[in-house]
From Swiss-Prot:
UniProtKB keywords: Glycoprotein, Golgi apparatus, Hydrolase, Lipid degradation, Lipid metabolism, Membrane, Signal-anchor, Transmembrane, Transmembrane helix
Gene3D superfamilies from the UniProt entry: alpha/beta hydrolase
Similarity comment: Belongs to the AB hydrolase superfamily. Lipase family.
Active site feature: S214, D382, H408
This protein's GO CC annotations: cytoplasm; Golgi apparatus; membrane
Cytoplasmic domain ranges by topology: 1-16
Gene Ontology MF terms: sterol ester esterase activity
PANTHER family on file: LYSOSOMAL ACID LIPASE-RELATED
Top-rank taxon, per record: Eukaryota
Pfam family, one: Abhydro_lipase
High-level lineage: Eukaryota, Fungi, Dikarya, Ascomycota, Taphrinomycotina
Membrane-spanning parts: 17-37
Protein name, entry field: Probable lipase C14C8.15
EC numbers, comma separated: 3.1.1.-
Length: 460
């Protein structure tokens, strides 16, 4: 590239970062103005936006069931609306964070251990999400956790530090910047092992399976790669759309942000919670309007069409999708994705980020050390997953399953995922875990032999 070309490229990148700064500043200004408005005036604007939306897009008005799901306050309400009960648990990590944990089971009389008689499965959510993201589907048949509960698995929904259900620390308030001083390393080293240890302590099993989505999947990879005790406790791992190595950046603005120096990202987003504004607008905007804004944002910045997710499903899901995390986690994820290596957090303040520096080599998570059955499920149109790059890093005993025409969010929200994604998850877990176990409990619980054979052969 010529000198003029390099200068032009440099100017474009800096210009795009400047535009990002301006957009963030503009959003902050609107948010502050909205906060200081009197409550009656905010309610008036809310009602007016609802009327305008209803007039121009009446065909997209949500039905009563969707309204109830949209208005659900938490994971407990969402599960109840779908006919399931939920137990709340709390896990204390060794560095002082209190993590909310949700155990899902059928609304039937009897002990949980009798209803959920198969080994436990832990679900790990993605970036800026919480446990609600797994159960905010329009139909219960489209929620992966519910499908596993119906199979008899002991299902647990995790909540990582900083989100809606894990906003406590024994030393620091969430208003203290020290509360938010954690990267993905802290989650991999403290949160996931603590959650797994707790789950195994409250039931009779000595092993567990993991299901992670997006960033949740890469966190599971990281935790398993460095913790021998954790590896010995995990029977199988299903990674849904692990966002380690994006296939491509859909827009120059996103590319410029991801490739920006870490200190510049801190200057843009601060050092506390990441994009708390998303949670704010989610609370003050009419849900269909908020869903439209999110949809436009995802289309513009990430080129996600969302064509496999119905408009009503988007309205419900986007009302529960976002939660808090630290800016440091986002910066860490940006370091991982731009280098396409699952590495530890780079503390170097150097202007030009590099996997190798003059002084040190950033530590990489040795995921090739993981020796357990791993299934990677991803969409063919998912621009957050470069499967060819991932294949070079995946450990033995791994298999990759591609879902045609699926994008990133389709894996957990797609309209057709019941017959595609859920089927794959259930089959993989049944194949790896349930074979020997079904035989061992057949007599103890009086299970019908024909039923057991049907489940194992995937004929029922």
């Amino acid at each position: 590239m010529t000198l003029n070309g390099n200068i032009m490229k440099y100017c474009l990148e800096k210009g795009e970062i400047l535009i990002s700064f301006l957009l963030i500043a503009l959003e902050s200004m609107f948010r502050i103005c909205t906060v200081i408005l009197p409550s009656p005036l905010r309610n008036w604007f809310y009602e007016q936006s609802k009327k305008v939306y209803s007039y121009f897009l009446p065909e997209l008005l949500v039905d009563d069931n969707a309204n109830k799901l949209t208005d659900a306050r938490d994971t407990i309400d969402l599960c109840a609306l779908h006919g399931y009960d939920l137990e709340e648990h709390f896990v204390r990590t060794t560095d002082g964070y209190l993590l909310g944990l949700h155990r899902v089971y059928k609304k039937k009389k009897g002990k949980i251990e009798e209803l959920n008689y198969l080994p436990p499965v832990l679900f790990i959510h993605g970036l800026m999400m919480n446990s609600e993201s797994w159960v905010c589907n329009l139909k219960k048949e489209d929620a992966i956790p519910f499908a596993l509960v119906e199979q008899g698995y002991d299902v647990w929904l995790g909540n990582l530090r900083g989100n809606k259900y894990s906003i406590k620390n024994i030393k620091f308030s969430s208003q203290n910047p020290k509360f938010w001083d954690f990267s993905l390393d802290s989650i991999a080293i403290f949160d996931i092992p603590s959650i797994v240890k707790y789950i195994l302590s409250v039931n009779s099993f000595d092993s567990i399976s993991l299901v992670g989505f997006s960033q949740g999947a890469i966190l599971a990879f990281a935790a398993l790669s460095i913790d021998t005790e954790l590896r010995n406790s995990v029977r199988a791992f299903i990674a849904l759309a692990p966002a380690i190595a994006p296939k491509k950046y859909s827009g120059r603005t996103v590319k410029s942000i991801i490739h920006a120096n870490s200190q510049l990202l801190y200057l843009m987003f601060g050092r506390n919670s990441m994009l708390g504004s998303a949670v704010f607008w989610q609370a003050v905007l009419y849900p269909p309007v908020f869903a439209k804004i999110v949809d436009l944002f995802l289309r513009f910045f990430l080129s996600w069409t969302g064509k496999n997710i119905s408009e009503t499903q988007k309205i419900v899901a986007y009302s529960h999708l976002y939660s808090f995390t630290s800016v440091k986690c986002f910066v860490h994820w940006a370091q991982i994705t731009r280098r396409k290596v699952l590495q530890m957090y780079d503390d170097s303040p150097g202007f030009k980020p590099s996997y190798y520096t003059n002084l040190n080599r950033i530590a990489r998570y040795p995921i090739e050390n993981i020796r357990l059955p791993i299934t990677l499920v991803y969409g063919s149109n998912d621009n957050m997953v470069d499967i060819e790059t991932l294949k070079t890093q995946l450990p033995p005993l791994s298999q990759c399953i591609q879902i045609p025409n699926y994008e990133h969010l389709d894996i957990i929200m797609g309209d057709t995922k019941k017959d595609i994604v859920i089927q794959q998850v259930v089959e993989q877990l049944n194949h790896v875990i349930a074979g020997d176990y079904f035989e061992s409990i057949k007599e103890e619980f009086g299970l019908d032999t024909e039923l057991v054979d049907g489940v194992m052969n995937h004929t029922i």
